[in-house]
Protein backbone atom coordinates (compact mmCIF):
# COMPACT_ATOMS: atom_id res chain seq x y z
CA UNK A 1 0.00 0.00 0.00
CA UNK A 2 1.13 3.54 -0.65
CA UNK A 3 0.59 6.85 1.05
CA UNK A 4 -1.58 8.87 -1.24
CA UNK A 5 0.39 10.99 -3.67
CA UNK A 6 -2.17 11.33 -6.44
CA UNK A 7 -3.45 14.59 -7.77
CA UNK A 8 -6.08 15.06 -10.41
CA UNK A 9 -4.80 17.45 -13.01
CA UNK A 10 -7.06 20.49 -13.28
CA UNK A 11 -8.98 19.28 -10.23
CA UNK A 12 -8.90 20.48 -6.65
CA UNK A 13 -7.53 18.19 -3.93
CA UNK A 14 -9.94 19.59 -1.35
CA UNK A 15 -12.18 16.53 -1.63
CA UNK A 16 -9.57 14.46 0.23
CA UNK A 17 -10.89 15.69 3.55
CA UNK A 18 -13.30 12.75 3.42
CA UNK A 19 -11.88 9.57 4.97
CA UNK A 20 -13.09 7.09 2.34
CA UNK A 21 -12.91 8.13 -1.29
CA UNK A 22 -13.33 6.30 -4.59
CA UNK A 23 -11.87 7.99 -7.67
CA UNK A 24 -13.81 6.50 -10.56
CA UNK A 25 -13.57 6.70 -14.34
CA UNK A 26 -10.28 8.47 -15.08
CA UNK A 27 -7.23 7.36 -17.04
CA UNK A 28 -4.61 6.28 -14.51
CA UNK A 29 -0.95 6.86 -15.43
CA UNK A 30 1.20 5.13 -12.81
CA UNK A 31 4.51 6.91 -13.48
CA UNK A 32 6.45 3.68 -14.01
CA UNK A 33 6.00 3.43 -17.77
CA UNK A 34 3.20 0.89 -17.68
CA UNK A 35 0.21 1.10 -19.99
CA UNK A 36 -2.47 3.57 -18.86
CA UNK A 37 -5.42 2.11 -17.00
CA UNK A 38 -8.67 3.33 -18.53
CA UNK A 39 -11.91 3.59 -16.53
CA UNK A 40 -9.79 3.31 -13.41
CA UNK A 41 -10.98 2.93 -9.84
CA UNK A 42 -8.82 4.02 -6.90
CA UNK A 43 -9.99 3.31 -3.36
CA UNK A 44 -8.57 5.56 -0.65
CA UNK A 45 -9.09 4.98 3.06
CA UNK A 46 -7.73 7.58 5.49
CA UNK A 47 -5.25 8.95 2.90
CA UNK A 48 -3.94 5.47 2.04
CA UNK A 49 -4.51 3.84 -1.35
CA UNK A 50 -5.91 0.40 -0.58
CA UNK A 51 -6.87 -0.84 -4.05
CA UNK A 52 -6.52 0.06 -7.72
CA UNK A 53 -8.39 -1.48 -10.63
CA UNK A 54 -11.07 -0.70 -13.18
CA UNK A 55 -14.79 -0.14 -13.23
CA UNK A 56 -15.12 -3.71 -14.46
CA UNK A 57 -13.27 -5.46 -11.64
CA UNK A 58 -13.72 -3.35 -8.49
CA UNK A 59 -16.99 -2.82 -6.66
CA UNK A 60 -17.00 0.45 -4.75
CA UNK A 61 -18.21 -0.12 -1.16
CA UNK A 62 -21.34 1.81 -0.19
CA UNK A 63 -19.55 3.77 2.54
CA UNK A 64 -17.14 5.35 0.01
CA UNK A 65 -17.75 8.79 -1.44
CA UNK A 66 -17.50 8.50 -5.23
CA UNK A 67 -15.63 11.26 -7.03
CA UNK A 68 -15.92 11.09 -10.81
CA UNK A 69 -12.62 11.43 -12.65
CA UNK A 70 -14.16 10.65 -16.02
CA UNK A 71 -12.37 12.53 -18.78
CA UNK A 72 -9.42 13.30 -16.49
CA UNK A 73 -5.89 11.96 -16.14
CA UNK A 74 -4.90 10.67 -12.71
CA UNK A 75 -1.19 10.41 -11.96
CA UNK A 76 1.34 10.43 -9.11
CA UNK A 77 2.09 13.84 -7.70
CA UNK A 78 5.12 15.54 -9.26
CA UNK A 79 8.24 16.88 -7.52
CA UNK A 80 9.72 20.27 -8.39
CA UNK A 81 13.27 20.39 -7.05
CA UNK A 82 13.88 24.13 -7.53
CA UNK A 83 11.23 26.73 -6.83
CA UNK A 84 11.03 30.17 -5.21
CA UNK A 85 7.59 30.85 -3.78
CA UNK A 86 8.48 34.52 -3.37
CA UNK A 87 8.93 34.90 -7.16
CA UNK A 88 5.71 34.79 -9.14
CA UNK A 89 5.31 35.99 -12.73
CA UNK A 90 7.84 38.81 -12.98
CA UNK A 91 11.12 39.62 -14.72
CA UNK A 92 12.31 42.82 -13.06
CA UNK A 93 14.12 41.67 -9.91
CA UNK A 94 15.12 45.16 -8.77
CA UNK A 95 11.51 46.37 -8.85
CA UNK A 96 10.10 43.16 -7.37
CA UNK A 97 12.58 43.01 -4.49
CA UNK A 98 11.77 46.52 -3.27
CA UNK A 99 8.03 46.50 -3.96
CA UNK A 100 6.54 43.19 -2.86
CA UNK A 101 8.30 41.76 0.24
CA UNK A 102 5.43 42.92 2.46
CA UNK A 103 3.10 40.70 0.43
CA UNK A 104 5.30 37.60 0.44
CA UNK A 105 3.79 35.73 3.39
CA UNK A 106 0.08 36.46 3.02
CA UNK A 107 -0.35 36.80 -0.75
CA UNK A 108 2.51 35.88 -3.06
CA UNK A 109 4.00 32.77 -1.45
CA UNK A 110 0.61 31.12 -0.73
CA UNK A 111 -0.47 31.91 -4.29
CA UNK A 112 2.70 30.34 -5.71
CA UNK A 113 2.18 27.23 -3.59
CA UNK A 114 -1.41 26.91 -4.78
CA UNK A 115 -0.31 27.26 -8.40
CA UNK A 116 2.22 24.46 -7.94
CA UNK A 117 -0.43 22.17 -6.49
CA UNK A 118 -2.85 22.88 -9.32
CA UNK A 119 -0.08 22.04 -11.82
CA UNK A 120 0.23 18.57 -10.28
CA UNK A 121 3.20 19.28 -8.00
CA UNK A 122 2.71 17.66 -4.58
CA UNK A 123 6.26 18.15 -3.21
CA UNK A 124 8.74 20.95 -3.89
CA UNK A 125 12.05 22.41 -2.68
CA UNK A 126 12.13 26.17 -2.18
CA UNK A 127 15.76 27.20 -2.69
CA UNK A 128 15.89 30.79 -1.55
CA UNK A 129 13.43 33.01 0.29
CA UNK A 130 12.89 35.04 3.47
CA UNK A 131 13.35 32.87 6.55
CA UNK A 132 10.30 33.65 8.67
CA UNK A 133 7.89 33.81 5.75
CA UNK A 134 9.21 30.59 4.20
CA UNK A 135 8.78 28.57 7.38
CA UNK A 136 5.37 30.05 8.17
CA UNK A 137 4.02 29.22 4.71
CA UNK A 138 5.46 25.70 4.92
CA UNK A 139 3.85 25.15 8.30
CA UNK A 140 0.50 26.59 7.20
CA UNK A 141 0.44 24.11 4.32
CA UNK A 142 1.40 21.22 6.59
CA UNK A 143 -1.36 22.13 9.06
CA UNK A 144 -3.98 22.34 6.31
CA UNK A 145 -4.61 26.07 6.70
CA UNK A 146 -3.73 26.82 3.06
CA UNK A 147 -3.48 24.58 -0.04
CA UNK A 148 -0.08 23.68 -1.42
CA UNK A 149 2.43 20.90 -1.96
CA UNK A 150 4.67 19.53 0.77
CA UNK A 151 7.40 22.17 0.92
CA UNK A 152 11.07 21.77 1.85
CA UNK A 153 12.46 25.23 2.62
CA UNK A 154 16.04 26.48 2.61
CA UNK A 155 15.24 29.95 3.86
CA UNK A 156 17.69 32.67 2.72
CA UNK A 157 20.35 32.20 0.08
CA UNK A 158 23.76 31.94 1.75
CA UNK A 159 26.40 33.90 -0.19
CA UNK A 160 29.46 36.08 0.29
CA UNK A 161 27.64 39.41 0.03
CA UNK A 162 23.91 40.02 -0.43
CA UNK A 163 22.90 42.19 -3.35
CA UNK A 164 21.81 45.68 -2.21
CA UNK A 165 18.24 45.65 -0.96
CA UNK A 166 17.96 41.85 -0.76
CA UNK A 167 19.18 41.28 2.79
CA UNK A 168 15.78 39.88 3.83
CA UNK A 169 16.35 36.71 1.81
CA UNK A 170 20.11 36.77 1.06
CA UNK A 171 22.53 36.30 3.95
CA UNK A 172 26.19 37.20 3.59
CA UNK A 173 29.05 35.44 5.36
CA UNK A 174 32.26 37.08 6.53
CA UNK A 175 34.77 34.48 7.60
CA UNK A 176 34.56 30.90 8.79
CA UNK A 177 33.11 31.77 12.21
CA UNK A 178 30.33 33.87 10.73
CA UNK A 179 29.57 31.16 8.17
CA UNK A 180 29.07 28.58 10.91
CA UNK A 181 26.95 30.97 12.95
CA UNK A 182 24.63 31.68 10.02
CA UNK A 183 24.08 27.95 9.47
CA UNK A 184 23.38 27.42 13.18
CA UNK A 185 20.74 30.15 13.06
CA UNK A 186 19.07 28.55 10.04
CA UNK A 187 19.21 25.08 11.57
CA UNK A 188 17.71 26.30 14.85
CA UNK A 189 14.94 28.08 12.96
CA UNK A 190 13.97 24.79 11.32
CA UNK A 191 15.02 24.95 7.67
CA UNK A 192 15.04 21.71 5.69
CA UNK A 193 18.28 22.33 3.76
CA UNK A 194 20.88 25.00 2.97
CA UNK A 195 21.13 26.92 -0.32
CA UNK A 196 24.42 28.38 -1.56
CA UNK A 197 24.85 30.89 -4.36
CA UNK A 198 27.87 32.84 -5.67
CA UNK A 199 30.07 30.52 -3.63
CA UNK A 200 33.00 31.25 -5.97
CA UNK A 201 33.27 34.57 -4.10
CA UNK A 202 33.77 32.77 -0.77
CA UNK A 203 37.02 31.45 0.56
CA UNK A 204 37.37 27.70 0.55
CA UNK A 205 37.41 27.83 4.35
CA UNK A 206 34.05 29.62 4.42
CA UNK A 207 32.54 27.16 1.98
CA UNK A 208 33.91 24.19 3.89
CA UNK A 209 32.58 25.61 7.18
CA UNK A 210 29.09 25.98 5.71
CA UNK A 211 28.99 22.39 4.48
CA UNK A 212 30.52 21.00 7.66
CA UNK A 213 28.17 22.91 9.95
CA UNK A 214 25.16 21.97 7.85
CA UNK A 215 26.08 18.30 8.12
CA UNK A 216 26.39 18.62 11.89
CA UNK A 217 22.71 19.54 11.84
CA UNK A 218 21.81 16.81 9.30
CA UNK A 219 21.11 19.37 6.59
CA UNK A 220 21.93 18.86 2.92
CA UNK A 221 23.59 21.68 0.98
CA UNK A 222 22.46 22.68 -2.51
CA UNK A 223 24.67 24.99 -4.59
CA UNK A 224 23.60 27.16 -7.50
CA UNK A 225 26.34 26.43 -10.04
CA UNK A 226 25.28 28.78 -12.81
CA UNK A 227 28.81 29.72 -13.91
CA UNK A 228 31.61 27.33 -14.95
CA UNK A 229 33.85 28.65 -12.19
CA UNK A 230 31.25 27.53 -9.62
CA UNK A 231 31.81 23.86 -10.35
CA UNK A 232 33.95 23.37 -7.25
CA UNK A 233 35.12 20.07 -5.91
CA UNK A 234 32.89 19.47 -2.91
CA UNK A 235 34.45 19.75 0.54
CA UNK A 236 32.40 16.65 1.36
CA UNK A 237 31.29 13.74 -0.85
CA UNK A 238 27.93 13.80 0.94
CA UNK A 239 26.75 16.70 -1.19
CA UNK A 240 27.01 15.82 -4.88
CA UNK A 241 25.30 19.17 -5.60
CA UNK A 242 28.67 20.80 -4.93
CA UNK A 243 30.66 18.60 -7.32
PLM features per residue range, with description:
Residues 1-19:
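Bacterial Sec-dependent N-terminal signal peptides
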Residues 26, 42, 47, 71, ...:
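Divalent metal-coordination and catalytic microenvironments
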Residues 28, 32-75:
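Histidine-rich, glycine-flanked metal-binding segment
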Residues 109-132, 149-156, 188-199, 220, ...:
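Divalent metal-dependent hydrolysis catalytic cores, especially in the metallo-beta-lactamase
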Residues 147-149, 207-223:
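Alpha-helix-loop-beta-strand connector modules within alpha/beta enzyme cores
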Residues 162-212:
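Active-site gating/metal-coordination segments in enzymes
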Residues 232-243:
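Single conserved hydrophobic/aromatic residue that forms the stacking wall/gate
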Amino acid sequence: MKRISLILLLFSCNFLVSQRIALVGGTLIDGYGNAPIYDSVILINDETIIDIGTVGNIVVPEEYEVVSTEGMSVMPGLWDMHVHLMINGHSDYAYWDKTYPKLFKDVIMPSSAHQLLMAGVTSARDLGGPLEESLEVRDMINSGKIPGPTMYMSGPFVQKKPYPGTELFRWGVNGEKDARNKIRILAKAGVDLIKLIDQDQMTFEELSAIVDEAHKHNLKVVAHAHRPCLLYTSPSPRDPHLS
